Amino acid sequence: MAKSKLPRSTPAARAAAVPPPRLAAAAQQQHHQQQPPSTPPAPVPPTKPSVAGASTPPRSASPVSNHDTDSVALSSAKKKKKKSKSKAKDADFIDDQEYELQQAAALAQRPRSPASLAARAQAQAQLLAAASELYRRIEGDAQGIPDDDAYWTSLPAHLRTFIRNALPLGQFPPAAQAALNENANDPANRHASTQAMIAVAQQLAQAAHASQRHIQQYPPGTHPYPPLPFDASIFADLALHPDQPLPLHPHPNTANNAHPTNVNGAYGQYSSSPNPPPTQPPVEPLPPPVVLYDNFDDEIDRFDDDGVDDAHYYDDAELDEDDEVLEADAGLLRARNRVWMQEGANHALRPNGLATHPDGMRSASKNKKKKKKKKGGAGAAAGHGDDEAHEIELEVPPPKPVPNHPPPSTNVSSVARNSNPPPPSSRAAGKQPMTFNSTGKTPARPANGLPPSSNSGKRSVSSSTHGHPPAANASANNAKIWSTSSAEERERIKEFWLGLSMKDRQKLVQVEKETVLRKMKEQQKFLCSCAVCGRKRSAIEEELEVLYDAYYDELEEYANHQQRWVSSGGTIPPPPGPGPFPGSVALDASGAVIGGDPLSRTRAAHAGRDTRHTHTHTHAHTHTHTHTHTHTHTHAHQHPHPHPHGRKASLHPESSDGYDDDELDDDAEYDDDDDDADYDDEDEDDDVELEKERAREDYDKRNPVPSARRRGTNDSNDLFGLGSSLTVKGGILTVADDMLKNDGRKFLEMMEQLAERRMHREELTNAELAASDDEDDVDGPDDVDDEDLDEEDEDEEDEILTEEQRMEEGRKMFQIFAARMFEQRVLAAYRERVAQERQLQLLRELEEEDDNEKAREARRMKESQKKKDKKKAQREAKEAERLKKDQERAAAEAEVRAQQQAQRDAELKKQEEIRLKKEAERKAREDEKAKKDEERRRRQAEERERQLEVERKRREKEEKIRLERELQEKAKRDREEAQRKAKEEQQRVQRAKELKAKEEQERKAEAAQKEKEARAQAQREAKQAAAAASRGASAAQGVPSSPSTGPKAGSNKAANASTPGTPARGGKNGSVTGPPTVGLGQDQVQPRGVHSQRSAASSKHAPGTGGPNAAGGLAAAVAASSVAPAGSSSNAVGSTLPAPPQGLPPRPSTAVLTPAGSSSQTSSVSVAANAGLPRPPTNLAGGGSSSAVPPSLGFGSIALNAQSNVPMPSAKTPGSSISPKPAQSFVQPQEKQPSPPGFGAAQSPMGAVYGQHAGLDSLRSPTLSNGLQNSGMFGSNGSMSSSLQSPSLGAPGMGGMTNSLASLNLNAAPLSSPALNVGNPLISSKTPGLGMESSTPTGHNLGHMHSPTQTPFSPMSGSGSVDPMRSRTASFADSDPMSFAGIRPGSSLSQRVPTYRSGAPTPIGPIGRPKAMDAIQQHMHDEHTGAIGNGRSSSTTSGSGATSPRLPEGILGSSALGGDDDIIDPKPRRVSHTIPIGGGATGSSMGSAGSFFGGGMGGGSAVGGGFGVGSSSPWSSFSGNNPTAPGPLSPAFNGGGAAPGSIGSGLATGNFGLNQNASTPGAGSSGSGMAGGAASDPWARMSTNSWDRARFAFEQPGGNGVGAGSNGGTPSGLGGIGGSHHAHAPGSHMGHLHHQLGLSAGPGNGNGSGSGGMLGSFALGAPGSGTRNLFGAPGSNALHPGAIGSALSPTLPGARHVSGSHE
């Protein structure tokens, strides 16, 4: 195998050539030796000298070089050393080359003359103009010239000849093949054989048209810069850095030229970043300097990548070849897409073909195929670390565009920029045959080139393969990708090539060869390492060397031919082919090889056959290698082999071109190999990133794609277009393009096939020789064998001929490949030289500008200095003149100043004298003034002392006077206090006597009557109680019960005269028409109609006729809850009291007096043995009104069970709303609330309840005489309007109650009598008052509070609903109210009162005893004549006059009311604003504060007050709302219920006894009651809410008032009405005091649930009721221990306290 004929340089030699100084010197020397003519003709290639002169200086000479060319050259030398197999003469050649390079460097350092620069620039401009024109013509038809023949004829003769000679012949039809064999060199035959190849080249060239167009837009010759000395390193560097844009023009992919399809980023670095388009001098750093380097493999890869980038192709094939060769050299930096990169860097090209250059100067977009190839290239490049050392960043400014020359490169670049992925990169494009249009200029494309076509890159190969594109866009784009189509460009490149010296050419070829070889080796390193493959690699390398050596010879011969042709002026035929190198192919505008279509059509069938043959061979070969190679390798071989075989078959016919068969074969093989290597290298770059196996697989995958892209070409299986497939996708141009794209797989396959063919041919030769020997030895053993042998020989000869033809074709293919690669390299070198020239020119211009600027600056400085000096002189002259003037002026001024100074001195002297004189005077004045001030201060001090003394004396005097006055006042107060006490004591004694006398008289008078009435009433009440119990439900509904009539006492009539007798609380419940009554029980609220009905009913009943008690009547309920049937008056039996006088309920058998006149109802409750204790009304007002219980205030029998159905006399004084009515539903029928006689339960009327609480049956206080006058606490005026009717009291009325306090029957005035209407409109307005029936149902129906006032004082039937107020017990007399208080029947107050009073904070006068009350009234307002002691004052009811039994000494409270004349003088009690019981009943509203019931109904002494309604009663410490005046009888806890003194919170609003704390008017609501704010009775010791004291029974103790309401709610009415009121009335004060009366059986919050009025019946507070009853017995939590029930009456067992009523 022939070895490389090119000398190889040793590393040392190469290193010696590297240093920039030597390179520059060599370039300079070369420049001098080869001066170009001043104006070479543009169309005609310049003469060799001019071309030589045009050689570019070494890039290293550029001052912009960024790389050390020494190191680069050194590394390149190392690479060469590794790869080279050169002989010793190579070193000599390199030495010579180095010498030339040194000369060039020296020349480069020398400045060029302007003339030479201008000539060079003009020549270049002409060259570029021609190229541009050609490209425009080519680009005129985007689809390419339809008629290839026309295009072919348009080519210059020398190009056609070159194409004919250079292009290998493919497989032809038998006739054509025979003709070809006969005359292989015949131009026509060659033309016919190469048409397919040309078509392939044209189509591949289309891929570079875009780039070329761009290049033409910035043609290298358009700049005025002088050429630089030639340096082969330029080409090496360009080849190594194909991806770096040539400084000649902006790369299509640059950002500046944002060509849509610009996938080539190589130029991007140049144009976008460091270097502007070549048409403009770069204003930014230029591309890195180019380093010549023999290893072009990498650069080839880069150029291949550029080809992949489509847009990077530069029209000149030289540049592509150089780039491809450079890329083939592993040691060099890759110039993918003109991006100069270090070999070691990752050179994987981006989709735009940019390698990942460290600088990052790469386009962002690439075709997918490029990406793959770039990846492979990157991997391959990574292996070329040495390339980094070889990179010389020569940033040559792009030449300014020559105005004369249009930018033809625009067309070229646009063609080159075809974005089809497969399209060759700029280098690949350069390697593709230059398209040539000699005719017609097509309009230049814009600089950006083609519109973007993402698919164009992929289709470029196929389109380039065809004269017609597989897709219109693809062909158009392909046409635009190639920028070397300009014939002028080719001419200029040719001139440049011819201008090079032989050594330069050799060096370029050597660099190209080494680059390709390196790339091939890199590609092979991924292949199998078996021995077979190793031998194949060796064969390939040898084949490559041989091919390149042969190609160099061809180059020389071709160059010589060209030179001769040029020198001859066309007398001799031009060299074959378009040039400038053997094998160059011209492409039409569509990228198809000029004239390729006819040939391709004629050869299509032959190609198909050859392809099939090839495949057969390929498969055989593939199988052979399959065992040793990876599958990828197998595929790679499989596809490549067909084409190489085809090529070899066609190459051998070409062997007659003056090349040995071997040489041709090698050349073709190498051409194939080289082409394949180029392609392989490109693919290899992709494969580097892919796996080694994928390298082949990718190639296999790409093969079909290119075949698809190259539709219309020969069978896609024919990889390289060898033989019959010149036009297929795998054509040699494609191989070159791939190689330029750093994809050397195809090239490697081609070379492998070539090598295999050569080996096969040698084997055949050896076999033939051996066979001939064998035949000689074994000749003729058998004729048949001889015949067979002959046939075999013939076949072998045919095969040999075919093989020779293929070898010849392979040689031609390699020529095309090498031409493509070399064109690219030379083009790169040429452009680099131009760039360097431009750069140097720019630098020179810059230096000139700097020098000029410096000169101008110097001139400016000089002029400025002169001006400054002049100005300075002027300033100095002026300054001197000024100084002179200043001196003169200063002298004059000095003289003047001297004179002035003298004058000033004299003046100062004068002034000083004057000042001294004035100072002396001033001092004298100051001394005098100081003396005066001192005197004045002294006088002032003395004056102050005098004043202080006077003041002290005055204060002493005043103090003395004050003390004396105080002593006098104290003495006076003492005297007055003593007198007052004495008077009070006297008055008290007198009152006590009077009361006692009166009580005795009344009792005596009433005793018989009451006794009689009591019995009758007891019977009636028993009956009524039974009826009420049965009708409890109906009573709750307000259904009136049949009233029980009772005897009417004349006294009651009399009382009624003043105040209409309390309407009898017959079984019929007086329904209060006011707001629904709040029943203590379930039926707390009743429509007013009910109350009004009750009141009406009660009014209808004649006095003494008990209204029918509703089953729900409070008294009935109480009685029921007491468990004592209403008829159980047996307990009442035993009362020794005389029959009550008329007007009072008849006494029960226990001598409870029944007021005959006031109420006809008879107390069915017989006073128990304990009747001596005053009992709170058993009828609880507050729950549902119990009509069954006519409220009868009176201390009837306490038996709770006994319902005192004492019909109250319905006689009412006008305006008395209180008429005896059945208790309202205010008290729930007992059926609903059986156990507690709460409001919810039917209860006996208050009075009844008072006497009828369970367990209290036996507890009966002796009835008090009802002789109390009707002055009643409410006054006889109807202020209470008989709101309080205590049927038991002669005239059931608060007045009666209060007045009868002495007897505690409080019958003085029936509640219905006007006495109760203490002017309290509330009562008259049906405000139920406890125990009062007011025609006006109050919000609190006192009726519900059945006899809350049914304290013994009077039945408290509220208006309407007040019926309950009317104690169903016999009137107070019946129920013997005082018996509740512990008063014995005979005594005005039972002796038990003291027991009660034992717990009272202050002594209480005996209730009902006139004298005691007198004493009490001493503290009461005098106007309250209705005080308990003064019961007679206004009470019109006649009392029985029976005196109460003896009053044990020390006994206070109700027991003090006993008949004993001896009056226990109570200790001074707190002055209460409330009137005494019964006193001042007529006060404001019920008699403000003074009524027995405490703060009257209206104001202070309302019934509620004294009666507990207002809490003004003695027992309510907090009368009404006035907590400050606790009555002595009631510990000071007014549950905070009604206003003091109001019966509830005024009997006015609430019925009597309803002290409603809540807003609910009625007893218990303060203010709402009759008199909300009456001052508390002196006796009122407990809060009104708490009728905890026994007196509560009397006064219906009323903190809560009669219905001392719950604290929060209205205090329950009298006797628990309040408590239960709490339910209907403002929540009963249950929480605090049980509803005092305990009548509040209704659920009151006071007692717990309301039933517990303090006094269940009088809040008897049976145990279990959370409250203590009025008597303090447990059962009412609020009951104060001193309650009557607890202490007052020893006979009253606490158990008897109505606990049931307290819920």
UniProtKB/Swiss-Prot annotation:
The species this protein belongs to is Mycosarcoma maydis
* Keyword Nucleotide-binding tagged: no
Family membership? Belongs to the NST1 family.
Please give the name of this protein. Stress response protein NST1
User: What exactly does this protein do?
Assistant: May act as a negative regulator of salt tolerance.
Q: Which residues form a coiled coil?
A: 748-1031
- Gene that codes for this? NST1
Give start-end positions of Gly residues composition bias.
Answer: 1598-1619
What ranges does the record list as Low complexity composition bias?
A: 7-36, 410-419, 453-464, 1024-1037, 1111-1135, 1158-1167, 1269-1291, 1431-1444
What keywords is this UniProt entry annotated with?
Coiled coil, Cytoplasm, Stress response
Q: Name one GO cellular component term.
A: cytoplasm
- Kindly list the organism's lineage: Eukaryota, Fungi, Dikarya, Basidiomycota, Ustilaginomycotina
Task: Indicate whether Ribonucleoprotein appears among the record's keywords.
Answer: no
